[in-house]
Structure formats: C-alpha cells, structure tokens
Swiss-Prot record:
Active-site annotation: 9, 11
CDD domains linked to this entry: HAD_HisB-N
Site label Stabilizes the phosphoryl group, positions: 51, 109
Catalysed reactions, as listed in the record: D-glycero-beta-D-manno-heptose 1,7-bisphosphate + H2O = D-glycero-beta-D-manno-heptose 1-phosphate + phosphate
Protein name: D-glycero-beta-D-manno-heptose-1,7-bisphosphate 7-phosphatase
Pathway membership: Nucleotide-sugar biosynthesis; ADP-L-glycero-beta-D-manno-heptose biosynthesis; ADP-L-glycero-beta-D-manno-heptose from D-glycero-beta-D-manno-heptose 7-phosphate: step 2/4; Bacterial outer membrane biogenesis; LPS core biosynthesis
Localization: Cytoplasm
Gene Ontology biological-process entries: ADP-L-glycero-beta-D-manno-heptose biosynthetic process; lipopolysaccharide core region biosynthetic process
Residues annotated to bind Zn(2+): 90, 92, 105, 107
Amino acid sequence: MAKPAVFLDRDGVINVDHGYVHDEHDFQFIEGVFEATAALQRMGYLLVLVTNQSGIARGKFSEERFISLTQWMDWNFADNGVEFDGIYYCPHHAEHGIGQYKEECDCRKPKPGMFLSARDFLNIDMANSVMVGDKAEDMMAAEAAGVGTKILVRTGKPITEQGEALATVVLDSIRDVPHYLLRVKK
C-alpha cells in the first residue's frame, strides 16, 4: 500500500542557505528541524530529501564531498531519532555545469525526476504527500509530480509572487509544518 511522504528541500529548509554549503562547519541546521521531522515521522509520513546541488556541476565542490556532508547530516538526524527514507540529489546544471555534469536532465527541479524516482522506489502516495521548499522551483517540481500539498517556507530564499501562487500555504519555517498538517488533515 502506498504511503504519503514529506519531500524536503535541503538548503533553506533543513539548513541555513549560505550558498553552496559543502562543509560541516558551514552547515547550520534550521531551528526546530529535528523536532519537526520527528513529528512528521510519528504522523506516518516517509521523509524524502530532494535537493538540487549545482555546486557539484559548477566545480565548487566534488560529488564525494557532497556525499560526505550528506552522511554527516543524516547521522545528525539519526542522533535525534529521525531516519530519512530516501535521499535524492541532482548534481547537474545545463548552462553552468562542467564535464559530465553539464547536462539537461530530468532530475533538476523544477523538473520532477527526483520525486518520480522516489515515488517508484518507495511506493509513495503522491496525492497525499507534501513538499516543503523555499523556492518556486520546489513548488513547480512538486506540482509536476502530483504532490498534493506544497508548503513554501520563509527560512530560505525570499518568497516570490510565483512561489506564493504555486504554494498551498506559506509558513515561517519547517517547525510549523506538523502543526499545519494536523490542522488541515483533521
């Protein structure tokens, strides 16, 4: 039986977006992220990370460095009782990529490739799933993948009119997501 998921962008949702974050010393968790994700898991949602990482494509850091940071991040969540069900990332950029990463792909948001891969692998009920992101591209990818609820948070990039128009709701941060979902899913 398909299960609903909460899809989470990384930079601006899980951590403060300092621009091309690739080192543990620059990785600052958003306040309340561990409590919020633990609550979402208790509510029965799968947790799936979906993140564009054009810093890899641009040569700002290696894919290995990203994977190492992601493992460190994942361990921090595990230490706080939270397990990700899936971690998906796009290392490509069609314009600014170099070498093998200069590619027009289906995984880079606003395209829905990461969402569809997660749906197929984890048997996700997309209509009852949620996207939490900080940009219009997050909302566009979620819409294209059939995600039912799209939440834009103010902890990342400035909210645009386009992002706000595509979102179901705009909240201050991920820490507000469980309370919102409990209110609307009653």
